[in-house]
Amino acid sequence: MTQLKKTSVRKELRTEQPSIYSFELDEIKQWLTENGEKPFRAAQIFEWLYEKRVSSFDEMTNLSKSLREKLESNFVLTTLKTAVKQTSQDGTMKFLFELHDGYTIETVLMRHEYGNSVCVTTQVGCRIGCTFCASTLGGLKRNLEAGEIVAQVVKVQKALDETDERVSSVVIMGIGEPFDNFNEMLAFLKIINHDKGLNIGARHITVSTSGIIPKIYDFADQKMQINFAISLHAPNTEIRSRLMPINKAYKLPDLMEAVKYYIEKTGRRISFEYGLFGGVNDQVEHAEELAELLKDVKCHVNLIPVNYVPERDYVRTPRDQIFAFEKTLKSRGVNVTIRREQGHDIDAACGQLRAKERQDETR
């Protein structure tokens, strides 16, 4: 029987049977054809996976028994197990998922007036080394397969099924650097955006990067209508290098050139994430410098008050200073908002993922 392989995943990191969630519709059609089955069955399989969200291949009752047995022999549905689920006072939910090899990742469900947003993880750990973030404390263990990323959304959706709610948007801003796992991230995007997949609209999906410049050009060339964000966090090279060591490899001027290429190629505006760190990058003169950097750039700035991470030394910017920073940007014509804080009490806010678990492991 023909095995369906994805060359973008290193073989030694794969389970013996891959998750069927890792495969796009056309890839499943190919596998069906090569195994003597009708390709139209792929749409039925996708319906069972993403509309009915079954827990076993046996539940796919409009498929023949022999096909269900083939699926069972070649794939698993998911290797994610829910280890812990926490709920914040504001309704934010954090899921700790255990992977097939014992590693754990975190996924966050955020509730908004306009719907439910899921923040997914793309790597076990992170190699980028941002000096304010908990996710990078243990380094990078491995990349996730597309199916492990897709399964995060499916698992959260199944939790929402209990209250007849729906995942309405997805942000790729969890643990890891998405562009460090580029091919699997792209497969994930295509699966969740497909009308027979999770059918989440492109403009309801946001990808964020710390600034891996070659991949920004590659992503621009995809011409996807996905929302795109860059973790900027500084108005100049000196401060950005202090906060984000990646800036030493991928310089700020070169990053801004890549941003301009992306905007020209896609016609889309870009979002800049700007964490405010007390006494580091949060003064009015920093806002003036940021406005100058972003002059004539089609963009939006998200201001993020720093979240507490015990292993880090950064302090929160006072509230009145945050508003002064915002006011300065607005006066210079920069489109800007202050991000609403969510999940702070369960360590689910920006920069906090994996912090609590890592503390528990080292006790």
Curated annotation (Swiss-Prot):
Positions of [4Fe-4S] cluster binding: C126, C130, C133
Cofactor binding note: Binds 1 [4Fe-4S] cluster. The cluster is coordinated with 3 cysteines and an exchangeable S-adenosyl-L-methionine.
Disulfide cysteine pairs (residue numbers): C119-C350
Catalytic activity: adenosine(2503) in 23S rRNA + 2 reduced [2Fe-2S]-[ferredoxin] + 2 S-adenosyl-L-methionine = 2-methyladenosine(2503) in 23S rRNA + 5'-deoxyadenosine + L-methionine + 2 oxidized [2Fe-2S]-[ferredoxin] + S-adenosyl-L-homocysteine; adenosine(37) in tRNA + 2 reduced [2Fe-2S]-[ferredoxin] + 2 S-adenosyl-L-methionine = 2-methyladenosine(37) in tRNA + 5'-deoxyadenosine + L-methionine + 2 oxidized [2Fe-2S]-[ferredoxin] + S-adenosyl-L-homocysteine
Descriptive protein name: Probable dual-specificity RNA methyltransferase RlmN
Name of encoding gene: rlmN
EC number(s) reported in the record: 2.1.1.192
GO CC, alphabetical: cytoplasm
Domain Radical SAM core: 112-345
Name of one Pfam family that matches: RlmN_N
Keywords: 4Fe-4S, Cytoplasm, Disulfide bond, Iron, Iron-sulfur, Metal-binding, Methyltransferase, rRNA processing, S-adenosyl-L-methionine, Transferase, tRNA processing
Primary role: Specifically methylates position 2 of adenine 2503 in 23S rRNA and position 2 of adenine 37 in tRNAs.
Other facts noted in the record for this chain: Reaction proceeds by a ping-pong mechanism involving intermediate methylation of a conserved cysteine residue.
Active site annotation, chain numbering: E106 (proton acceptor), C350 (s-methylcysteine intermediate)
GO molecular function: 4 iron, 4 sulfur cluster binding; metal ion binding; rRNA (adenine(2503)-C2-)-methyltransferase activity; rRNA binding; tRNA (adenine(37)-C2)-methyltransferase activity; tRNA binding
Family stated for the protein in its record: Belongs to the radical SAM superfamily. RlmN family.
Organism of this sequence: Bacillus velezensis (strain DSM 23117 / BGSC 10A6 / LMG 26770 / FZB42) (Bacillus amyloliquefaciens subsp. plantarum)
InterPro entries reported in the protein's UniProt record: Aldolase_TIM, Methyltransferase_A, RlmN_N, RNA_MTrfase_RlmN, rRNA_lsu_MTrfase_RlmN/Cfr, rSAM
